Regions:
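Flexible, glycine-rich phosphate/dinucleotide-binding loops
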Residues: 22, 74, 83-84
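Short, internal strand/loop/helix patches
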Residues: 32-69, 74-75
Length: 138
């Protein structure tokens, strides 16, 4: 697991669930906590009930990764790999690459990638709705 791989280097992961419990209950916070516990994911898990964090960060998908340096500056945003539904077929490891490059003291080659996953479930909208200004990042 990526979080375990980088833990010894001081990297910490935090999951934030911004999905509306009213739109798609399968992805609500409690359901995802159950999944977190089942798979023993090694990170803190927070709930963005108001969806203000998702709006502030511009979150489009779940998951949508954000990497911050020690100065809390955003240095990477986007996907983990290019085939999240089938890990063995991946050809790109964007999140791992970004972390390795940063920890080696190098500039991140691709600091912006398109997140891949289900859309954030917005309160008061149907489950596949996306904001009108949402688009691919690159």
């Amino acid at each position: 697991m990526i979080a375990d791989r980088f833990a010894s280097q001081g990297v910490r992961f935090v999951g934030i669930n911004s999905n509306s419990k009213n739109t798609y209950s399968e992805d609500d916070f409690n359901g995802m906590v159950t999944r977190l516990e089942k798979h023993q994911f090694p990170w803190i898990y927070l709930y963005d009930e108001s969806q203000a964090v998702a709006v502030a960060y511009g979150a489009l998908r779940t998951p949508h990764f954000y990497v911050f340096n020690k100065e809390r500056e955003l240095i990477y945003t986007g996907r983990s790999i290019d085939t999240p539904r089938h890990w063995p077929d991946h050809t790109k490891t964007d999140l791992i690459d970004a972390l390795e490059q940063h920890l080696a003291g190098n500039v991140i080659e691709n600091p912006l990638t398109n997140p891949i996953g289900c859309n954030v479930k917005w309160d008061g909208q149907e489950k596949h709705w996306m904001p009108s200004d949402a688009c691919d990042l690159v």
